[in-house]
Design a protein with these regions (language model features):
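Conserved SAM/AdoMet-binding glycine-rich loop
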Residues: 11, 19, 126-208
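Proteins enriched for Cys/Gly/acidic motifs involved in redox and nucleic-acid/cofactor modification
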Residues: 1-143
């Protein structure tokens, strides 16, 4: 791509390790953490204006991720191309450290959004006529947050969502077997607005 169009700006993001950042640093113009999305426009403008390489953030084990980064990431308003399906991040990060997965190292520990914030965003999507809403998280069924000094886990959150008036269905991904429970399965079975579908990583169910 660069050979055909030298002025083309190539950016790299996602679950990128420190090793990957060093490996690709000389091959792309911009490397940024997914939680730096609010700064992306500024970085691209700076890159175009100054024609300089923008240094990427490299997190070491000594550097803690700022929780404000996650809050800013949650508040990025998505632009939907599909008028029927809405996507709603409710948590980020993972605490499981499965042997095959890099997510805990690249996305950090689990952080969940406030209950009221999630419910309000779902209501906004319903007002915009979205019929299917996906709740998103690296380990979505480990969701846990406080509301009025009460701990709300994922089954309790689904119960609240099911009570919201409107013609819509809720899906969620990605789940982890460790956080599956009889309560969650019962809530899915009894809630008319929760789709009877379950997304699980196959690797995490293999003890071998």
């Amino acid at each position: 791509l660069k050979e055909k169009n030298p002025s083309l700006i190539i950016g790299l993001t996602g679950c990128i390790t420190e090793k990957d950042k060093k490996k690709f640093k000389d091959k792309v113009d911009l490397i940024f953490d997914i939680k730096e999305l609010p700064e992306l426009e500024m970085k691209i403008k700076k890159l175009i204006k100054n024609n300089i390489e923008i240094s990427c953030k490299i997190y070491s084990k000594q550097n803690k991720k700022n929780q404000d980064d996650d809050i800013n990431y949650f508040h990025i308003e998505p632009k939907y191309s599909n008028k029927n399906i809405g996507y709603l991040p409710i948590m980020t990060g993972c605490n499981n450290f499965c042997s095959y997965c890099i997510v805990p190292y690249t996305r950090g520990p689990e952080i969940s959004r406030p209950v009221k914030e999630i419910l309000q965003e779902i209501k906004n999507l319903i007002k915009k006529k979205y019929k299917k809403i996906f709740l998103l998280g690296q380990n979505v069924n480990s969701y846990q947050s406080k509301l009025n000094n009460e701990i709300f886990d994922f089954p309790k959150l689904l119960k609240l969502i099911n009570q919201i008036p409107g013609n819509f269905k809720i899906n969620f991904l990605t789940s982890h077997p460790k956080d599956m429970s009889d309560e969650l399965i019962n809530v899915m079975a009894k809630s008319e607005k929760i789709k009877k579908e379950l997304h699980l990583p196959i690797q995490s169910g293999d003890n071998e």
